[in-house]
Amino acid sequence: MTKGSVGKTLAWSGAVALSLGLAMAQAPAASAQMTAQAMMDRAEIEDLLARYYWNFGGGGAAFGSFYAPDAEMVLGKNSYKGAAAIEGAYKAVPADAPQRKSFSLNILPTNILIVVHGATATAQLVFTETVVDKQGDPPRLLTQGREFDHLVKLKGRWLISKRQILGPNAKPDDWPK
């Protein structure tokens, strides 16, 4: 073997070993077996969350329609139980709040982690709210936080059963480790 071919062989061996190591490594949240059904459920949940956040920009659906009938939304120290109470919480946001009086509001969900457990699931994400105050203005950051959701599949449809909205560096005490 030449010096160059030994180097190439070592490089390929290292790449294969690294690839195998990465393939065999297990992320903590990915420990649940990923079946075809779980992948479809995960896609449905991701779509539910995307539609939920799209709704803030005038998507039209009632916020309560994303929740199970007996759902709970925890926002800071306030808790709203039932789809009607959750809908009411959104309607109660004052007209002079930046989210309401701005030209546009966009909420960007990122770092979405969804784990499906049959007919239940959990989802956690980071949300970033941006507003454009007047047409032509640059967007500005309004707030950022974390969301932790418990979901349930009812009559073939994924719905939020509990939604906890927290600050940018918080985690609920009852959240799975």
Roles of regions detected by a PLM:
Residues 1-7:
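N-terminal secretory signal peptides that target proteins for export/translocation
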Residues 12-23:
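Bacterial N-terminal signal peptides
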Residues 28-61, 65:
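Short, low-complexity N-terminal intrinsically disordered segments enriched in polar/charged residues
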Residues 43, 102-105, 140-142:
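Transmembrane beta-barrel outer-membrane domains
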Residues 60-127:
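A solvent-exposed, acidic/Ser-Thr-rich amphipathic alpha-helical stretch
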Residues 107-109, 142-147:
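Short, surface-exposed coil-to-beta transition loops
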Residues 122-124, 144-174:
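Short beta-strand edge/turn micro-motifs at domain boundaries
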Residues 129-133, 151:
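Beta-strand elements of well-folded, non-transmembrane domains
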